[in-house]
Amino acid sequence: MTQEYDNKRPVLVLQNEALYPQRRSYTSEDEAWKSFLENPLTAATKAMMSINGDEDSAAALGLLYDYYKVPRERRSSTAKPEVEHPEPDHSKRNSIPIVTEQPLISAGENRVQVLKNVPFNIVLPHGNQLGIDKRGHLTVPDTTVTVSIATMPTHSIKTETQPHGFTVGIPPAVYHPEPTERVVVFDRNLSTDQFSSGAQAPNAQRRTPDSTFSETFKEGVQEVFFPSDLSLRMPGMNSEDYVFDSVSGNNFEYTLEASKSLRQKPGDSTMTYLNKGQFYPITLKEVSSNEGIHHPISKVRSVTMVVFAEDKSREDQLRHWKYWHSRQHTAKQRCIDIADYKESFNTISNIEEIAYNAISFTWDINDEAKVFISVNCLSTDFSSQKGVKGLPLNIQIDTYSYNNRSNKPVHRAYCQIKVFCDKGAERKIRDEERKQSKRKVSDVKVPLLPSHKRMDITVFKPFIDLDTQPVLFIPDVHFASLQRGTHVLPIASEELEGEGSVLKRGPYSTEDDFAVPPSAKLARIEEPKRVLLYVRKESEEVFDALMLKTPSLKGLMEAISDKYDVPHDKIGKIFKKCKKGILVNMDDNIVKHYSNEDTFQLQIEEAGGSYKLTLIEI
C-alpha cells in the first residue's frame, strides 16, 4: 500500500480563466472526456509536449486519456481489487466545501500543469475558531490542507529531492513553517463558515477531470481521500488580483548621528546640532515584527529634504528659499547635499537631486541603508534683519512603496535641527555642559541630560500627517536644465531593474505651481546670464572684478577695453591658458559656461598695432 502512494505525484489542472469562452458544462467526468476522445492524443502530440519540456504533463494527460477511454462498467470492476475505500462518513470527517465553478475543458483547452511536490501556504480567513475533532481536522484559522490530484504511472519518473516552494497568501511576508512534504492549496474565495461539516452537500456531484484529491497525515501514515470525500478548486486569478506585501506606515526607523542638545523640554522634539556643510550619516531600516522575512518587492524610494519646522504657507516658504538663494555666492549652491562615500553607495541607488532642498534615492528594506547628508543653510539665513531668532528647520524623510500606486508616502518622519557655522555645534554643546555643571540640582527647572549619558543618535519622530505635500524649491534659472517637479513615486516596476531611471511627475509642490504667467516665466529663463571674472595684472596683487554685460567674447573685449584702456578695435586675439598649460582660443561658449567667477592673470602684448590678450587661469 505504501509503495502505491510513493508513486503519486500532485497534478493540478488549472482552468484557462478568460482566455477561451465557456462553451458548455458537463454533468459527469465521462461526459466531459467524451469530447476529448474525439480529438485523440496522438504520439505526435505527446512528442511536441515533450520537446517543449512538459514531459510530466504529457504523461499525466496520457494516463487520464487511457483511463476514461475504458467504459465505466469495466473501469469500476477493475478498480475494486486495487484500492478499496468504503464510502466515508461525512459526519466524522472534516468537510471542505465544493466550489461550484464550471470547468473550461474542450478540445483546445487540454492544458495540464504538473506540480512537483510544490508546497503552497494557505492562510484561511480569520474568523470564528473552527471546532474540529482529533482526526487531523482543522484546529486553528491558519491551517494547511494537503491536496493530491492524480496517480502517476508505476514506471520511474525523475523527481526532485528538494522541492522548490513558494508562498501564496495575504500578506506574502507572513510565513507559516510547514513540512516540505505537504502540498497546500490557497483559495481566496473560501470563508470560515464553509469549513463546517454541514457545508458539504449530501449528494455532491462528481467533478470534472480537473477535480482534486486530498491527503492528510495521520501518525506518519498517508491517508487518501477521493473525489467523493473532498473536492477543492483553486480559482483563476487575474493580474489585478495578485496582492503583494504593502509596506505599512509604521515599520521604518531613521536615525541621525549628530550631537543632541542637553536641554530637552518635556514634550518637545529632540534638537540636534549640525555644522553647516558637514556630512552626517542617516541610517534607514525597516523594523517590522516579521524580521528575517524577505518581501516580494522590497525596494522603496525615500526623499530626504530640508523643510521649515513652522507651519507656513507655500508662498512664504518659497519666499524664504528665494531670499536664501539670492545671497549665495553661486547659483548652483544647494540647500542639501549627499556625499559619494563608498559606504553609502553600497546600500542605495537611483540617486536624484530632485530639488535644491531634496534628494531621493532607492534602497532595499531587507538591508540597512546609510546616506551622508550635509545642510548648507543656517536658520538665520532667511531674513535680512539682524539679531532676530532664526527659523527652525527640519530634516524630513518621506518613503514611498513600489507596491502601491498612491502618491501618498507610506511613512514620514522628521528631525528638528539647528545649523551652526565654523564648528558652532561643538561650541554650543560645550556651553550647555558648562552651564549644566554650574547649575545646582535644586535650581533645575528643565530636566537636563547628563553629559556621560548623552546619546549622539537621534531617532526621527514619525509624522502622522501623510497628505500634506512638502514644498520643493527649484530656482527659475535652472528650470530648463533640471527635471522639473520630479517626484519619487514609482509608476512601473521596470524602474527596479535599471539604475538611474528617469523619475515620473509627482504631486510635490514646486515653484511653478503658483499663479505665474507662463510667458513671464519663459522670459526669465531666456534672460542672458551674467558672467563675473576676477582679473589682475602680473604686477598687481589685488584683483579687479569684470562684469560682462553679455556672456560672450564681445562682452569680454568690451569689459577689458573699459577697465584697462585698451582700444576695442585694436584687440586681435584673446587666449585662455588653463592650469594644465593648455592655450585655448576664447569663444562665446567658454565665456558663457566655463569662466564665471574664475580668477585670471591678464597679459597684454602689443604687436603690429594690435593687442594680444592672454588670460592665465590661477
Curated annotation (Swiss-Prot):
Methylation at Arg-9 and Lys-116 may be involved in regulating transcriptional activation. It holds the Pfam family CP2. One of its GO terms (molecular function) is DNA-binding transcription activator activity, RNA polymerase II-specific. It is found in: Nucleus. GO terms for cellular component: nucleus. Residues 74-94 are annotated as: Disordered. The keyword Oxidoreductase does not apply. Keywords: Activator, Developmental protein, DNA-binding, Nucleus, Phosphoprotein, Transcription, Transcription regulation. Residues 248-474 form the Grh/CP2 DB domain. InterPro entries: CP2, TF_CP2-like. The keyword Transmembrane does not apply. The modification Phosphothreonine is found at T208. One of its GO terms (biological process) is positive regulation of transcription by RNA polymerase II. Residues 74-92 have a biased composition (Basic and acidic residues). Residues 1-91 are annotated as: Transcription activation. Residues 380-389, 427-430 are annotated as: Interaction with DNA. Belongs to the grh/CP2 family. Grainyhead subfamily. Transcription factor involved in epithelial development. Binds directly to the consensus DNA sequence 5'-AACCGGTT-3'. Important regulator of DSG1 in the context of hair anchorage and epidermal differentiation, participates in the maintenance of the skin barrier. There is no genetic interaction with GRHL3, nor functional cooperativity due to diverse target gene selectivity during epithelia development. May play a role in regulating glucose homeostasis and insulin signaling. Binds DNA as homodimer. Homodimer, also forms heterodimers with GRHL2 or GRHL3. GRHL genes (GRHL1, GRHL2 and GRHL3) show a paradoxical lack of redundancy despite their extensive sequence identity in the DNA-binding and protein dimerization domains and the fact that the core consensus DNA binding sites are identical. They have related but remarkably different functions during embryogenesis because of their differential spatiotemporal expression patterns during development. This is Grainyhead-like protein 1 homolog. It comes from Pongo abelii. The gene is GRHL1.
